[in-house]
Amino acid sequence: MLTHKTCQARKKMQVSFVIRDAEEKQHRNGVNALQLDANNGKLYSAGRDAIIRVWNTRTESNEKYIQSMEHHNDWVNDIVLCCNGRNLISASCDTTVKVWNAQKGFCMSTLRTHRDYVQALAYAKDREQVASAGLDKAIFLWDVNTLTALTASNNTVTTSSLTGSKDSIYSLAMNPSGTVIVSGSTENILRIWDPRTCMRSMKLRGHTENVRCLVVSPDGNQVVSGSSDGTIKVWNLGQQRCVQTIHVHKEGVWSLLMSENFQYIISGSRDRNIIVTEMRNPSNKMLVCEEQAPVLSLGYNIDKTGVWATTWNSDIRCWKLPMYDRCTLNSSGGLDAQWTQGGTELACIKGGAAIKECTVLNDKRYIITKDSQDQVVVYDVLRVVKKEQLGAVDYEAEVKKRNKQVYIPNWFTVDLKTGMPTIVLGQEEVDCFAAWVSIEAGLPECVDPTTEIKINYGKLLLEALLEHWTPHNMPPNDMDQDMHGNGYFQVPKHTPVIFSEVGGRTVCRLLVRDAAGDSESTLLQETAPQWVTDVVIEKNIPKFLKIPFFLQPHPQMTKPERTKKDRLVANEFIQCRKVCEHVLEKVLNAETTPSGGNANNSLQNSQSDANSEGSQLPAEERIELWCNDVVVDPNMDLRTVRHFIWKQSTDLTFQYKTKQNFNYDGK
């Protein structure tokens, strides 16, 4: 017996968020699973965009959307309705199993027992028991009545474990009375347990590839399986063997649906076909339809005259089922058996487009995306908004047009797995505090022309995402307005923010606007990593990144005897005009007119006291900097020169020379 608790061990963490609309009424990626509540006509769909949506299938209107159920942050792989439609259980690639109030659409509790993707669920209606399984090779049994009674104070639940699986589990099935549970895995075999005793009773061999879908007969005597090997097999558990192999698909069988009398199989395949087959006589089969993409799941409509189907695409379609009629009178007076016409599209729930391509622009603030409908969009990562809808334009041309010759370090990564842009901030391979820029470049709308402020993109964004969070242990006198936000901008309050282990499990998910809540604030205190609280709560400034470089005279200098080569260190965002000022003031000992800001020998704070009336030209108009035989733009910063011009792993090297209209000896 294992015990689940909500506390988490402290591990390396990352923060991610999704740039999206406040309400996403359409699936933005494939749909993995369906559940129909025949009592009220509600269809529940589990999306690869991490959202469960509810649809009204009784209306003939195109607007079937009822609500979204959001708390996962990765593919939702399977769902089951239980308790006569009052509750719903979901399984996700975020490694969690969640319990939902199906009527109101909110998450009641989260189970974190699995250690990897949770791929499949099975439900025993008569016992109100659910089983979950996934890539961690584990199967857990849950009492639904216990799960639905969990509260913030009563948050511990006991589960039974079915052991023995040696590979990742992709399919799971149970009969209504809960006497048999079957799993299918990449072992290519079926394992059978008695969930009442948690004892394994047998394993069945026959498939040659992963077992992707399973159905158990109500009496628990038969199992039908579909495999990536393209076959459907019928198994007799009493005889412990395969009694029939059905070949009706050209590629893997990913979804199965049985008729109530367990005589007809409806199968959906990677070959995009949905086929009805008589189990006792597989030659009696009928193509229902050819879908637009590989079929992921199937489910009956209310009166079972049609079947809802989902695919890799985001649309959900209902197809009319053909019926097998054994009582058709032929011309000679005998009886023939034939299929009635099916395959008509009865309804369609349209989905949205999934983002398939993404380019981070050189300024490391904007990304350009292209979706499955060839629509190109520009997103502002810093402000967490869609900036511009460009339409069906040339994607590569737009990237080229908008990319500036500027280098800013990577400070985030983009994940497109859900079909929407998920931005990931961390401290591992990519440091989210790496991007220091001038406020003029990063936030031109906030520029004060009398100052030269440097801003850190990662710091500003974290402060905006957690603007509403006030830790409980902060003294009241410290909680003034200056402690909240970044002072420049806010991000959309509907933005989901996710704290997760690096390369692993989700620990906390909340919306920006909800961070002020008591439970959310407590959860943030328990889960937010130190590098987040340092900048958001303690208001610490991230460290500047520095670049070493050499400075030497150009061969064309009028004083060739000056050959000294100086090694300097400066903040990487220092502009080359500061290097020009340093050359004039410290190397050539000339009077300068600073272009603003400060610089000293290390170029951190350069400020010349010499500002005579006879030297009014700024340094960049009197000094040329060269790198790799290229004249350097004084507006470039050091990191941009190193990336685009120097292009070497060795220390950056500048050569300087005076322009023709300036003689440093003529002071």
From Swiss-Prot:
Protein family per UniProt: Belongs to the WD repeat WDR48 family.
Biological process, per Gene Ontology: double-strand break repair via homologous recombination
Record organism: Drosophila ananassae
GO molecular function, one term: ubiquitin binding
Record text on subunit structure and interactions: Catalytic component of the Usp12-46 deubiquitylase complex consisting of Usp12-46, Wdr20 and Uaf1; regulatory subunit that, together wtih Wdr20, stabilizes Usp12-46. The Usp12-46 deubiquitylase complex associates with arr/arrow; the interaction leads to deubiquitination and stabilization of arr/arrow.
Role summary: Regulatory component of the Usp12-46 deubiquitylase complex. activates deubiquitination by increasing the catalytic turnover without increasing the affinity of deubiquitinating enzymes for the substrate. The complex deubiquitylates the wg/wingless-signaling receptor arr/arrow, which stabilizes the receptor and increases its concentration at the cell surface; this enhances the sensitivity of cells to wg/wingless-signal stimulation.
Key word Repeat present: yes
Each WD repeat, start to end: 26-65, 71-110, 113-152, 164-203, 206-245, 248-287, 290-329, 350-389
Keywords: Repeat, Ubl conjugation pathway, WD repeat
Protein name: WD repeat-containing protein 48 homolog
InterPro entries, alphabetized: G-protein_beta_WD-40_rep, WD40/YVTN_repeat-like_dom_sf, WD40_repeat_CS, WD40_repeat_dom_sf, WD40_rpt, WDR48, WDR48/Bun107
Region: Disordered, residue numbers: 591-615
